[in-house]
Regions:
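Active-site beta-loop-alpha junctions enriched in small/polar residues
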Residues: 15-19, 42-46, 70-73, 109-111, ...
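Conserved phosphate-coordination/catalytic loops
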Residues: 18, 22, 83, 87, ...
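Residue-identity detector for threonine
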Residues: 18-19, 78, 103, 159-160
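Generic detector of intrinsically disordered, low-complexity, polar/charged segments
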Residues: 1, 22-27, 64, 106, ...
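Structural motif corresponding to the early beta-alpha repeats
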Residues: 37-140
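Boundary/entry segment of secreted carbohydrate-active catalytic domains
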Residues: 2-24
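Acidic/histidine-rich catalytic cores of soluble enzymes
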Residues: 8-9, 25, 29-32, 38-39, ...
Length: 184
């Protein structure tokens, strides 16, 4: 397939979770060795090595961050728990900015009780609480709908249309939707 789109890897990004057993360094070096210029990082791997080391490894290998997973996880039973989740999203936005990443992937959070409508409202309220901070740091918020089988524990946002509806209601160009073909 000479000259085909498959020869151009300039827009291909590796989701770090596909190499979850690797350290951040191993994943970034693996991208570099494979000719990939982009990686989607996971926060747990950033935290394992620290933000400064992550930045160094990325720079040393010429690999850029396409997105950081995961922010979100907004629904909670108490106001204090919701605020703790919002505060964690502020830290995630800071991590994006420090790694020159313009997109925080939001896995919105599962069902803390039996009130699906309230959980979805808390998702929108949570995004609204962080959007101005994201704008100030030039970080986009990408709402990722997950397959409905994950509604109980990972995300009460299960469809593309639900994601688009939330983004539209928030009304900021900084809020959009990211899709993982596994979930749609």
């Amino acid at each position: 397939m000479e000259g085909s789109a498959f020869q151009d890897l300039s827009r291909l990004s590796l989701n770090q979770y596909t190499t979850h057993a690797w350290s951040l360094r191993e994943a970034v070096e693996g991208c570099n060795n494979a000719g990939l210029q982009w990686i989607g990082l996971w926060r747990d791997k950033i935290q394992e090595c620290g933000i400064d080391e992550a930045r160094r490894v990325l720079q040393d290998n010429g690999v850029r961050v396409s997105g950081i997973c995961r922010g979100g996880w907004f629904p909670a039973l108490t106001a204090a728990e919701r605020q703790a989740k919002i505060d964690d999203n502020f830290r995630a936005i800071d991590e994006c900015a420090q790694l020159n990443c313009d997109t925080l992937i939001l896995v919105c959070g599962g069902l803390p009780d039996h009130d699906l409508a309230e959980a979805r409202k808390q998702v929108q309220d949570g995004i609204e609480a962080i959007v101005d901070y994201a704008v100030g740091h030039n970080v986009r918020l990408g709402i990722e709908p997950l397959h409905p089988m994950f509604a109980a524990d990972r995300s009460v946002i299960s469809t593309t249309s639900q994601s688009l509806d939330i983004a539209e209601r928030i009304g900021s160009p900084q809020v959009g939707v990211v899709l993982d073909v596994y979930h749609i």
